[in-house]
């Protein structure tokens, strides 16, 4: 039986690969997509998500979400993904539009209609998820779990300690981590290992139309290089759903720093239980890299 999922995203070049996997992995049933400001503005992430859905002829409803963080000024990652978020490929024009309600309400409505609890996957800042949990707490029993790409038990990638998705809206992340729902965190501990090799990247143009499109986008992606390999951060959240055996997880207490001058956005991961607090997050700490690379090749071969 396919696993029903809702995907909250901020495309973003590596988001495009994660979306492909969510659509084409035979184990998954992607039922709803929502967008959030993150890598670029929410108008751009929505446009990019609709372009991808049209490219793959995927009839999946999409709702536009939060344009700004809960309490602070927005930041983006255009330096990594380009000004548009997905430069490098000329997508065909289309007339698709997002559905006419905010993302967190679209998630609420879809959860309440679902015949069974649904897995939420968030691969951008957690603003929409925080709005859902704070404004619609009645939805919690209908959430099977939340799988996120975000955080780190050590070094960051946008500050010395903070990972971008958490640092973009620390208050939202703090709200989510305090919510009591089951959370799996695929952070930089594993995503920095999730590298597509130059040899594999060179085969993409001959793989299929998706391979050609991704190869064009990758030429503008700044999380690595075509010569040294590219990190597939967001794809790890999808990979865990399909191949949890590739990941080493540890239940930990995790809190989000929202006040520090130099540490705001840091995920404080209590690996050794120093704080004596109960675990609230299953933290991915290691990855079977070869197995991950093999799975990526298999799923992208299906993305015709």
From Swiss-Prot:
Its EC number is 3.2.-.-. One of its GO terms (cellular component) is cytosol. GO terms for biological process: purine nucleobase metabolic process; purine nucleoside catabolic process; pyrimidine nucleobase metabolic process. GO terms for molecular function: purine nucleosidase activity; uridine nucleosidase activity. It is an enzyme of class 3 (hydrolase). The active site is at residue 233. The keyword Plastid does not apply. Keywords: Glycosidase, Hydrolase. The keyword Hydrolase applies. InterPro entries: I/U_nuclsd_hydro_CS (IPR015910), Inosine/uridine_hydrolase_dom (IPR001910), IUNH (IPR023186), Nucleosid_hydro_RihC_nonspecif (IPR022976), Ribo_hydro-like (IPR036452). Belongs to the IUNH family. RihC subfamily. PANTHER family: INOSINE-URIDINE PREFERRING NUCLEOSIDE HYDROLASE, NON-SPECIFIC RIBONUCLEOSIDE HYDROLASE RIHC. Hydrolyzes both purine and pyrimidine ribonucleosides with a broad-substrate specificity. This is Non-specific ribonucleoside hydrolase RihC. It comes from Shigella sonnei (strain Ss046).
